[in-house]
Amino acid sequence: TRGATSTKRRRLARHAQLGKLTRIAPGYYLDTVAITAHPDPGTVVAIARLAAIQNKHPHLISSGPTAAWLFGLPLLEAHPLHVTTVSNQHPSPINLPKIHAGSLHFPAMAVRPHRPRNGRSPAMIRHNGDLLSTTLEDTVVDCALSLDEEEAFVVACAGLHELARYRRFYRNDSRQR
């Protein structure tokens, strides 16, 4: 709703009140049907929340388990959204509201941005043109340092397997993804 006129804000609030729109983050709404009609509504909500965070805070990128999830690496359990700041500042937690879409309920959450390890800004990669995350290499290292042993091992094996599948300097010789 940033930059929206008061008329547009009232219209958004009215649609949200009627249940046509669902507030996913302060100032960000999503069509309720996009959540309720999707076969995996949790994924829709997570991606929408992540997109809202990155739109409002462009210095935050997905990292750790969230980046592993974006890369399609196997995680043994669900994790809260994990973001890292690429600036020198340490932003305060971002509070996301609870979401009610039809009969579906998603709890409110606070996303706590992390500072990069060793003070170096992580390398970034863009997923599907929209969501930014750490590179696969940094994601594997971050997960190895932050997840429990078993889950870290699973993510590391899958990440290293993915890295071994593609040879940047010999693209024509690489196996098809």
Task: Give the ranges of each region predicted by the language model.
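Short gly/ser-rich loop at a beta-strand->alpha-helix junction or flexible surface loop bordering the NTP-binding
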Residues: 1-176
